Amino acid sequence: RRQRQMCIRDSYMGSYPDGKRVFVKMNTSPILPGLAREQIAPQLLWTRRLADGRDMCAQEWLTGKILTPHDMNRKQIINILTRLHRSRPLMKQLSRLGYTMETPVDLLQSWKQEAPEVLKRHQYLNSVIDDLRRTVPGFREDHATIVHGDLRHSNWIETESGLVYLVDWDSVRLTDRMFDVAHMLCHYIPEQHWHDWLTYYGYKYNQTVLDKLYWYGQYSYLSQITKYFVNQDLDNVNREIYALRVFRDKYGKRR
């Protein structure tokens, strides 16, 4: 059956003649079927290879809402992240696709390679990178796992039935799970709830974990600054830089 499509960048709302709607996206992550099986992402309906070499996939259309920052403290979200981070099949699939483990040093190198030139020349951001180089945390490859890489609240969808899904897998990578955890805590969880959040997730609450949280928290701000800058969202670029300053001023003095 043919579809009508309404394009929003590389995403589409497709509708069949009978009125059934689907969400269509170009060149999405090949791990979507595995994510759907784990009930982390919406159900995948089909995939097709187009004549120009691009891949098109269709997922079930979800009627619901995007989570707000105030929604991000739910235990349901921690449960989804735990399921993602502990999924050996997803991790093995990424490895077969050519993804390699990224150590903290690799992450810093990746940022320097991928960040726009204007950010590379930013004096304050360079000082942050220098500090991160001097304080690289320990890394155990056997503890590394699949991470989403961009846990903004706008990438979480709640259906009318109350199911929550994580979408937009363009930033997925293999690294320390603290990559995702630090983003959550630094951006959405008040400090007085960090202990409960971390212990519910499965971390011990000690100085080693907090030092790692401080390091990956800074990196999460750098990542978001880059994403917003690439999307020409300068208001959020400035908000993230300001939030990074506040985070460093507040927690850096305690170490």
PLM regions with names:
Residues C186-Y188, Y200-R255:
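Helix-rich C-terminal or lid/interface subdomains of diverse kinases
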Residues T159-V209:
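Active-site Asp-x-Gly
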Residues L50-H70, V105-P116, Y219-L234:
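A glycine-centered beta->alpha junction motif in the catalytic cores
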Residues T145, D150, N155, D168:
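Conserved catalytic-loop position in the HRD/HxD motif
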Residues R1, P89-G149, R254:
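An alpha-helical support segment within catalytic cores of ATP-dependent transferases
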Residues R9, Y16-S87, Y188:
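A conserved alpha-helical element in kinase catalytic cores
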Residues Q3-I8:
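Short, small-residue-biased leader/transition segments that mark boundaries at the very start
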Residues S15-V22, E158-V164:
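Active-site beta-strand-loop-beta-strand hairpin of nuclease catalytic cores
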